[in-house]
């Protein structure tokens, strides 16, 4: 069993010297965005050239849930010498598209997403959708994954959050960081080594507080303690590395808080319109995983993956394990409860062999034999949520007009463990008053 540790052991920490408005704004936000007529973003990558980044308006102004005022949103397009192209939105700090070269010099968009802002506003994760939406490409926060019962205790104080996923809070609550408008900090990054941009969100003390009777908050919700400032820097280099660096500062001088950020991109290396990804090979650098109860909250144990459908220590076709009920009854029940794979893997301790760019630890490798594309995930986080799009039910149409269904993509959500605020044996997600954390994940394509 892993002993309790703090953010200090997982990331650099340094000492540095509302609800009603949000719900109303979300309703208005959807109405304003409905006028959006943004063209599809399915154009293939350009001819290989140097590193570049551009910025353009994306859709019509939408309402900022924090202020209630309409704001313009933007799309950033990063390209490298290989012709790889990444499109990033200031709405939700969403990764909209990633075009990667494959066999025969063919490019494909390898993440699921929508073509228009209207679709992101109305279909990603607003509270009008039961149990949230798919969170395509979102920057997830303030707390990624689930918190049991939508409640946790910190320093003797009980905090309550919206129960937007059955009895639990999922991916931050009713709004989450993915439904907010992020703002660019500084100029566009463009050096000989990389291009990129930093997007910022200030999450106030009491974020996700809601009045009694609000969906998911029958008795009202206190929201999260402490104001935090979140800066996420997205970069692309000529090696095909898509870097995501999170910097979170607790702006409060007295209140601690909990933080667990991640990226919720859905990958299909054959292309987002290619159908099931069951033949793609998955490898996860983990000897253990955290099994869950009937509502997908960890039981508190770290179970060996050996001899179970959760064993991806060697490259394994996704379809071999996703519905494998032939090993043991416990594992079978885990798959049935989650309708497939939707679990947290406990990443192995870093070794010289598993150390990659920026000194990060190997989390996972995915590959597609047909296209020849490969994705390697590097991180400093202790876990990764591997989710095989179990709940995509054919009601969403993607960026190229293709209908998305189960097993057509998968996520590698690098993270601290689900429900860590309620499970002291897990690595701690507490960010103390005045502290700053830094954490990085790299998605490397080849």
Identify the residue ranges that each predicted region occupies.
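Secretory targeting and sorting signals
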Residues: 2-41
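An exposed, glycine/acidic-rich loop-and-rim segment of catalytic or binding clefts
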Residues: 46-84, 89-446
